[in-house]
């Protein structure tokens, strides 16, 4: 019995030794994740912009910055909750850094607009960066860089990160949704309704005016 078990045990040790570094690399990669919360007007648009970025694993639409627990979309857009429409971006910092994300973020919004973003007006549509302690300096530097390039005062605030409430399922991945929605053009798919909304809102046109060729367009 021992003569049979010994070779098996040696084989087990050999395999374990060979596999351990591989498992270690997997664990290291699994830990190489970060996130940042950004408000840039309509969260459908911000989600669409950043889900195409290499290194970003997920973008979730939601609400943050307010004082109402578990707010609904209707409550937030009506006002009085203190919340912003925002997204939380999950990314791999070994592929894309916080600095790179903020570079793209500023070029995907009009950071000189204090009343909202594009055709969407009011507090819930204002832009903001909700920074974790280790992201504050990076955000400040990104803001100063954007301000120097535009030659105008940036009004996008850098705020302390606060609880993020995930928006209703209806709003997630709206820009590529296949469900039918009723519009003034009749029932159309969400993804087509999104394209019409974005175009009518003038988002990309305004970005070109503000940022020129550096605009981060969908």
Regions found by a protein language model. Name each.
Residues 7-25:
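Bacterial N-terminal signal peptides
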Residues 1-7:
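Positively charged n-region of N-terminal signal peptides that target proteins for export
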């Amino acid at each position: 019995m021992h003569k049979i078990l010994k070779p098996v045990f040696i084989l087990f040790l050999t395999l374990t030794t060979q596999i351990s570094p591989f498992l270690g690399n997997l664990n290291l990669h699994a830990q190489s994740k970060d996130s940042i919360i950004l408000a840039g007007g309509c969260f459908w648009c911000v989600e669409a912009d950043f889900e195409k970025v290499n290194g970003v694993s997920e973008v979730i639409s939601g609400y943050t910055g307010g004082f109402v627990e578990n707010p609904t979309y209707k409550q937030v857009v009506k006002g009085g909750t203190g919340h912003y429409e925002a997204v939380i971006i999950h990314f791999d910092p070994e592929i894309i850094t916080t600095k790179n994300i903020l570079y793209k973020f500023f070029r995907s919004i009009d950071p000189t607009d204090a009343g909202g973003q594009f055709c969407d007006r009011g507090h819930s549509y204002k832009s903001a960066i909700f920074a974790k302690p280790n992201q504050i300096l990076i955000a400040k530097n990104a803001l100063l860089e954007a301000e120097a390039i535009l030659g105008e005062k940036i009004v996008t605030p850098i705020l302390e990160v606060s609880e993020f409430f995930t928006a209703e399922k209806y709003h997630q991945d709206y820009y590529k949704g296949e469900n039918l929605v009723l519009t003034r053009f009749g029932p159309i798919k969400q993804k087509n309704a999104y394209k019409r909304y974005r175009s009518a809102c003038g988002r990309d046109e305004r970005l070109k005016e503000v940022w020129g060729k550096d605009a981060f367009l969908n």
